[in-house]
Amino acid sequence: MAKFEFGGPPRFAHQKRGLAKLIACNGVGALLMEPGTGKTAVTLDYCSLLALASPRREARVLVIGPLAAVDQWALQAQKWVSPQVNVWAEALGGSVMQRVEALRSRGGKEIAKPTGGRGRGSGDEVRALHANRSWALAARRDGIELDRKTAAKAGPDVLGDGKPRLVIEAVNLDTLSQRRQVGSKTMADVVLSAVTDFDPDLVVIDEMHKIKSVSSNASRLAGRIGSRVERRIGLTGTVIPHSPLDVYGQWRFIDPKAFGRVQPNGERKPATFKAFKEDYAEMGGYMGHEVVGFKNLDRLEEIMGERSSVAIKEECLDLPDAVDTVLPVALSPKELKAYEDMRTKLQVEFREEDDLRADAGSGGGDAATAASRLVRMTRLRQITAGHLPDDEGQVREIGRSKAKTIASLIHDTLEDEKRIVVFGTFTRELAALEEEIADKRTTVLRIDGSTKPEDRLAMRQRFGSDEPARLVIVAQIKTLSVAVNELVTAQNAIFASLPWQRDDIVQARDRLNRLGQKSATTFWYALAPNTVDDIVFQAYQDRTDLEKTLMNHIYADRK
């Protein structure tokens, strides 16, 4: 085999160690790496190796994860997958049954009567069913990115036979939670059958700690899926979010025999939760049925270490001080329609203005016109934030895709973080974020332009204190982007919407990544792909001409 070529930027030392561990464990293991340390890249490296070694010249990978994680696999695959491999990566969309049918289709099974029909933009190829409903889809053939329409119509076979193929299907963890009856079967049975039809070489569970609950539907089905697939990888930075007993449900998927007891004949049986508790929990309390402590934790750690690689951000000395991570947001059909309608409306307005200026013999680059257009283009940012402004100045909610995705990130990926900052722009956006994020174990501190100075100070001081409560600040970016020092207690900040001014973003970042910060920081950017969100973020990164790029976006023909 030719020397392996990594895709994307060079890997850090801890990522290379993680890949070596997965290889040594024959693809049965865990990457216990903190958010922002590059678990996805390591996993895609291993997936690339599977494709290169595949007897059928196609490696199939099923990824299961929470809402905030699944789109990442489609959007990051082209960056990290080896250039020696052609790749198809998809975040399955549609109803649960449509996702199930799509998964079977990717395995080559023909679906006679698809749920909801094939829909607009669907091809007739057997492996392309419901690809038009995917939340995110990316395909790269011979180093060239294929447009989504072409890929969706052909399915994975669009990759051709020139290079080994890597086919990645990512599904929301909720797909495993369904228990309703489907004829004589439960939905869990239907999902399991679909996984079998897809015939994956590897199953990956992203944010694996979400299957820690022993009795949850998702955890039990994950265990059943794991028993049918040769290779299983779990990814999480918080493997023990609450207690060492959280390990059982996760290792039931990875290696159910790891904590099992050896039988008299020398065979090791799969572990039971009862035996696991006996081995690692101190029981007491009422009638001896309450967990009052833990024991044998060195042995627990030793067994976990046999199949895991650990990376702690502040200990990865070759990591940059700050990590930028894009959080893709799949807008709803209603939000997408509102966005395209507004873009078309602005396009008509601007062209009419251009024609009037041309007739008058005046140029089109005056500052007043540019400022006016920038103000009107703010409507596009409001729409990606879930709100639609009308001509009378009234604003109504049209969806919460972004707020729900951010809430999923906070409660799933960042479940173990006690302090998190969310920066937004619009008042209604902040209200939606507050409602989606707040729960019984998370207190939201909301700060906007109307918050009294004394209340702001009190909230900032509370956030900067040693109070054990889990606190999330949701703030308008201009209210906390300067002269604030208390945010260094957080290692994660999420930009729900980005301001036009680059300096506002830089200043907001500096509130966390500054003197007094004891850990590496991660900045998350919630971006709806192919919208104004992408443009503002790219302008921030590249220091490009924002106005010119925005106008190109407005004038571009719809795809």
Q: How does the language model describe each region?
A:
Residues M1-F4, P10, V28, G36-G38, ...:
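Conserved Helicase C-terminal RecA-like lobe
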Residues G8-C25, K402:
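N-terminal pre-P-loop "Q-motif" helix
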Residues V42, E58-K79, P241, L245-D246, ...:
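Conserved Walker A/P-loop ATP-binding site and its immediately adjacent core
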Residues V70-A138, G143, K257-A258:
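Conserved helix-turn-beta segment of the N-terminal RecA-like "Helicase ATP-binding" lobe
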Residues E90-V100, L173-Q178, K212-S215, G424-R428, ...:
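Conserved helicase motor
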Residues A170-Q178, V190-D197, S216-E230, G260-V395, ...:
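Inter-lobe coupling linker of SF2 helicases/translocases
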Residues S177-R180, H242-P244, L430-E434, R456-L457, ...:
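SF2 helicase motor core recognition
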Residues W500-K559:
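A conserved SF2-helicase RecA2
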